[in-house]
Amino acid sequence: MADLYQLQRAMRAMRQSAFQRGALAILDLGSTKIGCLILRFDGLDPSLDSDQVGSLAGQSSFQVVGSAITRSRGIEFGEISSMQEAERAIRTVLQSAQKMANLRVDHLIACFSGGGPRSYGLNGVVKIENQIVRDEDIARVLSSCDLPDIGDGREILHAQPVNFALDHRSGLVDPRGQIGNNLDVDLHMLTVRAKTIRDLAHCVKRCDLELAGVASAAYVSGRSTLVEDEQELGAVCIDFGGGSTSYSIFLKKHMIFAGSIMLGGNHVTRDISLGLQVPTAVAEKIKTRNGGLIATGIDDRDLIEVGGETGDWEHDRRTVTRSELIGIMRPRIEEILEDVRAQLEIAGFYELKSQKFVLTGGTSQTPGLDTLASRILGQQVRIGRPLRIHRLPQAYSGSSCSALVGLALFAAHPQDEWWDFELPNTSYSSRTVRKAVRWLRENW
């Protein structure tokens, strides 16, 4: 655990250095595309009313000065599969974004959806020594949290306090300075495979940059697409990526659970390619232009020219109906939604009073997805687009860029993490996530 704290604190120090230099690169490592933004920081933003505890909360105002997107290479299921290919793709997108910004950056923050994320709900309690809560008490109560056995080869990606209680007065955001006898904390911890982070750090180093932070794509997508009421009352953001589909549950403006399944839009494209006997590139084009999930009477008469370059005139000139295409696409999307629902049930999401679903990511733009999702997941479903940020190009305002925009918000205005405090070394056993979600529902 100490090694992890050192790694995370070192990245935070690099982030502070980037703030001082005034520029930072943001990188979204997707299986379909890699996106990059160059942010220029203008210093502390006095207009921000931060409700966080840590010293980095509400850090800086910023604007986008460079941006680029390139086709993903060397990335599968949200993590690096080929170091050389990934390095070339990252160099390409970084060079394009830096050229647009007309400046060079030395630090980079990245997000990814891979690594097999696992969520844990932790709880800790300490007695206040002088009755007035101080920074030392915050550190002590965090260190008293039950530490789970996360297993070999895994590291903590996020460890965020989501609720403080002082003498059973729950829902406190910042208890410092208040008077009481017992301080409780609830903390959400997200772990991933250590190899995923190590490969990313090594690849960034090969690109002559320093890794100044990492984040879950599910988490940052939620930060950019969920409106304030949804984050407060309870909602889940489902990010439909190319290689995987990730999701994050928010309550009281904090992420309390996250996970992913290894199915995404690329699997739909593959199904079309196999079903229509066409190359993957043609299948992707057909999916984008003509795809859908809810068939109507007119779709039986709506003909789609498949095309091809086999040399067989009849084969290359054949057509299929849109109903046939929907029949190929829908089973895979239903499988993804049913798998997500199963994991949300395990997490206890359906025990929350508010059950809103926000769909984002490239595949979320498929016509009829919101209707199909409302039948499988729940009634309150909408398609989410990222918040507008200063000087963000219009091309980056769609659902496919939710994680990229959310990562920019995360970089400038991070929430507190466990390692932001000086912690003594203590370990106990963990609580289950379902108990943690139920506790939050009953006490907040």
Please describe what each predicted stretch is.
Residues 134-136, 261-274, 369-370, 377-385:
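Gly/Ser/Thr-rich active-site loops/lids in small-molecule metabolic enzymes
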Residues 233-275:
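Glycine-rich phosphate-binding loop of actin/hexokinase-like ATP-binding domains
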